[in-house]
Swiss-Prot record:
Family matches, as SUPFAM superfamilies: SGNH hydrolase
Catalytic activity, EC: 3.1.1.-
Name this polypeptide is given: GDSL esterase/lipase At5g33370
Keywords: Glycoprotein, Hydrolase, Lipid degradation, Lipid metabolism, Secreted, Signal
InterPro entries associated with the record: GDSL, GDSL_Est/Lipase, SGNH_hydro_sf, SGNH_plant_lipase-like
Organism: Arabidopsis thaliana
Compartment annotation: Secreted
Length: 366
């Protein structure tokens, strides 16, 4: 009898130990990422799509020096935020390696090519549109519940830091994709912006209804200033006027929508990151940030290295830290570090109603 009791006690202890390994530590915080190629860290590698970053020289400055599916020479913004949190960057949701304790650290649902609208990026075929990313979020919650129970899952999701980056493709790869696009015939630009913002509000509200309580929402960058647009639309290196107009309409309305949404839910659940201004700082004065250029991409071909894809046959700069743009559309790791630093410590001009460092301090007190 005594031997049986001892065995039961040992079994109970083992179960307790295994369970404690699965339950996140009190100071750990899940990190959930949604959006497009600016934050995708490899989901599209698992899909039959042309929107991929799985070839050299992508990843040339990543710790492994190999392509990872990130549209960067090295780390991207989710990686840099994770670095600040002292955690591993969340894995792509489609990765078969995302399970058990890795699942409890969060997940990256982002997919290159998508937009707020489901008809954005149709030329890329098989991508994870934002509606599907939210379905995966619901699936993620079920998987986490299976590991730690529903109560602990709700605590994890409510306490998670969420990052969402959307909007640029709705202009570059939809409204302005071709002359007389379907959306440009349906809407004037101001009306299109209002429509896109209204659809984005539905996405963010759905995210809140699914349990997200700390959501960093980044705006678009200065879309007319990326090398791809300079190559197609610029005569003398000036930013493309129409896309800059789109950014100047979209971003202030996004901030106002987030303010209204916070008032609706009665908390500062949503944080607006003014990434347009963050980019313009180093685009307008690249030398002040240690760049030799903010017009020419490090990797590419044609004018401004802005034509086509970054491939093994492309022009490649020897020092990526001297270039604000890595490829025709995406910032270099160094530029991403500047943006991440503003997300962390930026003034109200950049982060509204507060920056990430303040969020982390406030949340640590609750």
């Amino acid at each position: 009898m005594t031997n049986s009791v001892a065995k039961l006690a040992l079994l109970g202890f083992c179960i307790l130990q295994v369970t404690s390994l699965l339950v996140p530590q009190a100071n750990a915080r899940a990190f959930l990422v949604f959006g497009d190629s600016l934050v995708d860290n490899g989901n599209n590698d698992f899909l039959a799509t042309t929107a991929r970053a799985d070839n050299y020289p992508y990843g040339i400055d990543f710790p492994t020096h190999r392509p990872t599916g990130r549209f960067s020479n090295g780390l991207n913004i989710p990686d840099l935020i994770s670095e600040h949190l002292g955690q591993e960057s969340p894995m792509p949701y489609l990765s078969p390696m995302l399970k058990k304790d890795k699942l409890l650290r969060g997940a990256n649902f982002a997919s290159a090519g998508i937009g707020i609208l489901n008809d954005t990026g149709i030329q890329f075929l098989n991508i994870i549109r934002i509606t599907k990313q939210l379905e995966y979020f619901e699936q993620y919650k079920v998987r986490v519940s299976g590991l730690v129970g529903e109560e602990e899952m709700n605590r994890l999701v409510n306490g998670a830091l969420v990052l969402i980056t959307l909007g640029g493709n709705d202009f570059v790869n939809n409204y302005y994709l071709v002359p007389f696009s379907a959306r440009s015939r349906q809407f004037s630009l101001p009306d299109y912006v209002v429509f896109v913002i209204s659809e984005y509000r539905k996405v963010l509200r759905k995210m809140y209804d699914l349990g997200a309580r700390r959501v960093l929402v980044t705006g678009t960058g200065p879309m007319g200033c990326v090398p791809a647009e300079l190559a197609q639309r610029s005569r003398n290196g000036e930013c493309a006027t129409e896309l800059q107009r789109a950014a100047s309409l979209f971003n202030p309305q996004l901030i106002q929508m987030i303010t209204d949404l916070n008032n609706e839910v009665g908390s500062s659940a949503f944080i607006a990151a003014n990434t347009q201004q963050m980019h313009m700082d180093f685009i307008s004065d690249p030398q002040a940030y240690g760049f030799v250029t903010s017009k020419v991409a490090c990797c590419g071909q044609g004018p401004y290295n802005g034509i086509g894809l970054c491939t093994p046959l492309s022009n490649l700069c020897p020092n990526r830290d001297l270039f604000a743009f890595w490829d025709p559309f995406h910032p270099s790791e160094k530029a991403s570090r500047i943006i991440a630093q503003q997300i962390l410590n930026g003034s109200p001009e950049y982060m509204h109603p507060m920056n990430l460092s303040t969020i982390l301090t406030v949340d640590s007190m609750t």
